[in-house]
Amino acid sequence: MRINPTTSGPGVSTLEKKNPGRXAQIIGPVLDVAFPPGKMPNIYNALVVKGRDTVGQQVNVTCEVQQLLGNNRVRAVAMSATDGLMRGMEVIDTGAPLSVPVGGATLGRIFNVLGEPVDNLGPVDTRTTFPIHRSAPAFIQLDTKLSIFETGIKVVDLLAPYRRGGKIGLFGGAGVGKTVLIMELINNIAKAHGGVSVFGGVGERTREGNDLYMEMKESGVINEQNLAESKVALVYGQMNEPPGARMRVGLTALTMAEYFRDVNEQDVLLFIDNIFRFVQAGSEVSALLGRMPSAVGYQPTLSTEMGSLQERITSTKEGSITSIQAVYVPADDLTDPAPATTFAHLDATTVLSRGLAAKGIYPAVDPLDSTSTMLQPRIVGEEHYETAQRVKQTSQRYKELQDIIAILGLDELSEEDRLTVARARKIERFLSQPFFVAEVFTGSPGKYVGLAETIRGFQLILSGELDGLPEQAFYLVGNIDEATAKAMNLDVESXLKK
């Protein structure tokens, strides 16, 4: 395990006279560096540019070697702004890839792509570091057993269950509850699985990253008093960063997650927001390196880059990394090469609906649009599969009848259809759930609902046993027993009002 020379002073000083080069050309975030004959750095080696700019300010820029050009020159991509760099500046080859701190010291902290803390909470223990470029686990290390990753969120566990060690695409516009759902998943994995989470903010708005951090502190996901008790490590490479940083920040987050999986043998949740920005940054870097663009102007190495990231996200015999990736779809075109390449790797999709959010049904997960490869009778069992299919059929029938209801009203429906609508409305409300992390906003305590409880609840609604209960009794409750208790309270309240 190497100490990271880019983040620890002694590491650089020992290498200073080892392999120095000189900056020969600087074009935006791309540097060409000349080295002495026979001393060329390897691809992916970290280079450090140290010196003073034209106004005497200290400059410290880390780059990553991307191409060997010949004539003892390499082309490298900078991980931070190249303002103030000049030709002739000394560039030191660290002799190793970028390495970042890993382990318990990362929890509750915010890092940049280099693994440097950016939250003004002091230095991080860098005794244990991992290089960000690592090979995917070998076949013999993989855990091929198909198992459900229980989240405690009814709509997810029943209709679009997550695979342990799988990859899930999270689709949703602004303001439909993506962040709250992410925070609830982080909270639930810590409580139910004893696991931790790593959040990789890739090329998104700095304001959103800051809001997420503040909300995590407010909801207790990050414990300010005792950082070691926090449940998440944050790695940010936001929109204002150079493309090199945005391209590599996903790997930094993944490396931190791999440590928890391989060394601590934990179940880890890895969030990537947004996977499209990873592809976009790769496209920018590819153009800067002079590669011929491929379809729609994307990099020719699109599938390779995506595969090198996604193949490291998997279950091994030690633990698992389950990844939830927000997917931006440019111009809502699902055939665009970026989302199309992402879909090839996904095991499940969770689609958030603005219509449900407008009705106040949270989490606003669309039960008909969300899918999962795990929803098969041989994996989840006949009972689960049958219940999920009947819930979907009832919801679909209600959706088909909505136009008729809007024009003619409920009275014009057949008795059977009226019963279907009543049950579908109960199902829709029962798919909502109070979240632990939303307690501070809603005032109602959060609920973790086990899969068996979830299936039992929906079976009771579908069988007609609860047809006599008012539909508002099913809104924002945990299991079905809470719904029946709420119905009794509503009866008592209405009797008192009379």
UniProtKB/Swiss-Prot annotation:
Top EC category: translocase
Catalysed reaction equations from the record: ATP + H2O + 4 H(+)(in) = ADP + phosphate + 5 H(+)(out)
Amino-acid biosynthesis is among the record's keywords: no
This protein's UniProt keywords: ATP synthesis, ATP-binding, CF(1), Chloroplast, Hydrogen ion transport, Ion transport, Membrane, Nucleotide-binding, Plastid, Thylakoid, Translocase, Transport
Cellular component annotations (GO), alphabetically ordered: chloroplast thylakoid membrane; mitochondrion; proton-transporting ATP synthase complex
GO molecular function ontology, one term from the record: ATP binding
Physiological role: Produces ATP from ADP in the presence of a proton gradient across the membrane. The catalytic sites are hosted primarily by the beta subunits.
Known partners and oligomeric status: F-type ATPases have 2 components, CF(1) - the catalytic core - and CF(0) - the membrane proton channel. CF(1) has five subunits: alpha(3), beta(3), gamma(1), delta(1), epsilon(1). CF(0) has four main subunits: a(1), b(1), b'(1) and c(9-12).
Family of the protein in this entry: Belongs to the ATPase alpha/beta chains family.
Protein name as catalogued: ATP synthase subunit beta, chloroplastic
Gene: atpB
